[in-house]
């Protein structure tokens, strides 16, 4: 059996059916204009999205050993790949901008695309990209703006979780912001109602009754007087004097400006946005030193790291190197210096690491002392302080019970 025949027999027989179910990927962010307006105008959405994007962009990547597998990008050296992922992806863009563009697409569109030209990495906007499935393998090609076709060995494809039309999707990712579009629209309608309510100069919850029959001219005159005397847009609020048998009473549930706050509903919408983006709400509301640190760690371990693992998995598949996220240089996860020093001191005194290794962990220069490069053997303070604990001490050798 030849190599090509072996490959043909190993292809997934069900791929043709999978391709027929979804021949071309579709955009899950179905209301991009609404999403864009919400990102630019709604504070909580802007803040949570930027927290995820900026936090993910702070993480670097570690390039490990090369796997013995067939990859799309051949001949790339470890140092070159490390430079592309951590210093400069291409001659025209810094690494922070590149990372933020990729994470933003993954967050808002559910997919991200990186173009590999053989020497550099370039971000390709996910909103304009389509994936065409293949009947035998996985992906046939990538189509950008219905004009440019990319081969599968030119695009690094990163896809978020998705469940479309009752089945998993291989080529479409689920936009995270799309899950809160309904909440954002309801929130916008509430605030628009409040704004129009005030702009129209409405008298809150007030209706006038009279036993007398007023003609059309008198009613219009009275309405004009009320609009002049009680207009929130102009700040008019004169004392209302009723005569001619007129009585005032509320006519709606909105009896004061406090009823227009929608505080509980707005808080519910804010919570939904935090849940969708995976941001602990305490990081936005503020807390104390006891709960801020655990929630920052929770945010990274449950939101940022899983997202970056999707990215590094695609990079590993494309380049063939073991690539992992590195959070060591993230300022928010830096351990307390005093606690770290005590921990390292304990490791040195118990013979786990050397003194200079501990200094290296603290970003200190090594000392030119022979003892600092040796493992310290702990003293047996419970016994005779010599030998191994449990094997020394007790009755002296050569003595008898009668001595």
Swiss-Prot record:
Q: Where is this region: Disordered?
A: 379-403
- GO cellular component: a single term: viral capsid
Report the sequence similarity comment from the record.
Belongs to the phage portal family.
Say what the protein does.
Answer: Forms the portal vertex of the capsid and plays a role in governing correct capsid geometry. This portal plays critical roles in capsid assembly, genome packaging, head completion protein attachment, and genome ejection. The portal protein multimerizes as a single ring-shaped homododecamer arranged around a central channel. Binds to the terminase subunits to form the packaging machine.
Q: Where is this site: Cleavage?
A: 10-11
Biological classification of the source: Viruses, Duplodnaviria, Heunggongvirae, Uroviricota, Caudoviricetes
Q: Where in the cell is it found?
A: Virion
Kindly list the biological process annotations in GO that this record carries. cytoplasmic icosahedral capsid assembly; symbiont genome ejection through host cell envelope, long flexible tail mechanism
On the tree of life, the source organism's domain of life is Viruses
Enumerate composition-biased segments (Basic and acidic residues). 394-403
Q: Which organism is it from?
A: Escherichia phage T5
Please verify whether the record's keywords include Transcription regulation. no
**Name this polypeptide is given:** Portal protein
Q: How does it assemble?
A: Homododecamer. Interacts with the major capsid protein.
């Amino acid at each position: 059996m030849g190599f090509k025949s072996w490959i043909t027999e190993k292809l997934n027989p069900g791929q043709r059916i999978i391709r027929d179910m979804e021949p071309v990927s579709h955009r899950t962010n179905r209301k991009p204009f609404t999403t864009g307006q919400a990102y630019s105008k709604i504070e909580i959405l802007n803040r949570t999205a930027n927290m995820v994007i900026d936090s993910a962009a702070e993480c670097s990547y570690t390039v490990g050993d090369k796997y013995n597998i067939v990859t799309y990008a051949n001949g790339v050296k470890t140092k070159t790949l490390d430079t592309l992922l951590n210093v400069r992806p291409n001659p025209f863009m810094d690494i922070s901008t590149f990372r933020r563009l990729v994470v933003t697409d993954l967050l808002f569109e559910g997919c991200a695309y990186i173009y590999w030209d053989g020497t550099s990495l370039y971000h390709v906007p996910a909103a304009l990209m389509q994936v065409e499935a293949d009947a035998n393998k996985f992906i046939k090609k990538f189509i950008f703006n219905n004009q440019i076709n990319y081969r599968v060995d030119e695009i690094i494809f990163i896809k978020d979780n998705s469940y479309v039309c009752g089945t998993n999707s291989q080529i479409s990712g689920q936009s995270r912001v799309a899950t809160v579009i309904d909440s954002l629209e309801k929130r916008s309608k509430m605030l628009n109602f409040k704004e129009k309510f005030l702009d129209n100069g409405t008298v809150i919850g007030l209706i006038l009754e009279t036993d007398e029959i007023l003609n059309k001219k008198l009613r219009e005159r009275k309405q004009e007087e009320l609009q002049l005397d009680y207009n929130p847009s102009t700040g008019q609020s004169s004392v209302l004097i009723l005569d001619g048998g007129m009585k005032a009473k509320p006519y709606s549930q909105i009896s004061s400006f406090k009823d227009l706050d929608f505080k509980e509903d707005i808080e519910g919408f804010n919570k939904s946005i935090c849940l969708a983006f995976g941001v602990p709400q305490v990081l936005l509301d503020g807390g104390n030193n006891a709960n801020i640190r655990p929630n920052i760690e929770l945010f990274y371990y449950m939101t940022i790291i899983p997202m970056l693992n999707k990215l590094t998995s695609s990079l590993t598949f494309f380049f063939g190197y073991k690539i992992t996220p590195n959070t060591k240089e993230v300022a928010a996860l830096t351990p307390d210096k005093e606690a770290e020093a005590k921990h390292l001191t304990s490791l040195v005194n118990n013979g786990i690491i050397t003194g200079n290794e501990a200094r290296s962990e603290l970003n200190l220069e090594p000392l030119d002392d022979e003892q600092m490069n040796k493992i310290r053997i702990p003293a047996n303070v419970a016994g005779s302080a010599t030998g191994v604990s449990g094997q020394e001490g007790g009755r002296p050798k050569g003595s008898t019970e009668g001595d």
